[in-house]
Amino acid sequence: MAKKIVGFVKLQVPAGKANPSPPIGPALGQRGLNIMEFCKAFNAQTQGVEPGLPLPVVITAYADKSFTFIIKTPPAVTLIKKAIKLDKGSATPHTAKVGKITRAQLEEIAKTKMKDMTAADLDAAVRTIAGSARSMGVTVEGVV
C-alpha cells in the first residue's frame, strides 16, 4: 500500500547551504519531519551545483513522518541575472532598462529550465524567458 501524503512544503534553498535555521526548520518542524536528515540529503544532492544558487525544492511529507523531495531548476530570474551579470532588476521595468540579453543567452537559459516548464518547444520556452527578462527591465534582442 502506498504511503499517505499529509502535505507538501515548497521552499527555495541555496545549493549546498541547507541548515535547520528559518525558513527550513519551522517549515519542516511543523510537519514533524527530521530537519537534519533533509539538510544532509539536500546538501549531498546539490554538491555539483554552484554553491549559493537558490533552488526550488518540493518536499512531500508522509503520515509516517518520512519525506521525499524533488529539486527543481533555478528560477529564470536568477539565471537571467547570472547570464548578464546583474545584481537586481529595474525598479521601473518599462522605463528604466538595466541591461541587454541576446537570443543565444535566452536559449541557453530555456534549455536549462525546459524540464520544469510547460512550453511545447524551445522557441516557446525562449519567449517565456524573454517575458521574464522584460519584466525585470532587461532589453531583449532577437525575440519578437
UniProtKB/Swiss-Prot annotation:
Task: Give GO terms for biological process.
Answer: translation
Tell me the Pfam families matching this sequence: Ribosomal_L11, Ribosomal_L11_N
Is RNA-binding given among the entry's keywords? yes
Keywords assigned by UniProt, alphabetized: Methylation, Ribonucleoprotein, Ribosomal protein, RNA-binding, rRNA-binding
Kindly list the cysteine pairs connected by disulfide bridges.
none
NCBIfam families found in the cross-reference section: L11_bact
Give a short account of what the protein does. Answer: Forms part of the ribosomal stalk which helps the ribosome interact with GTP-bound translation factors.
Q: Which HAMAP family match?
A: Ribosomal_uL11 (MF_00736)
Subunit annotation: Part of the ribosomal stalk of the 50S ribosomal subunit. Interacts with L10 and the large rRNA to form the base of the stalk. L10 forms an elongated spine to which L12 dimers bind in a sequential fashion forming a multimeric L10(L12)X complex.
UniProt protein name:
Large ribosomal subunit protein uL11
The protein's organism comes out as Polaromonas sp. (strain JS666 / ATCC BAA-500)
**Source lineage:** Bacteria, Pseudomonadati, Pseudomonadota, Betaproteobacteria, Burkholderiales
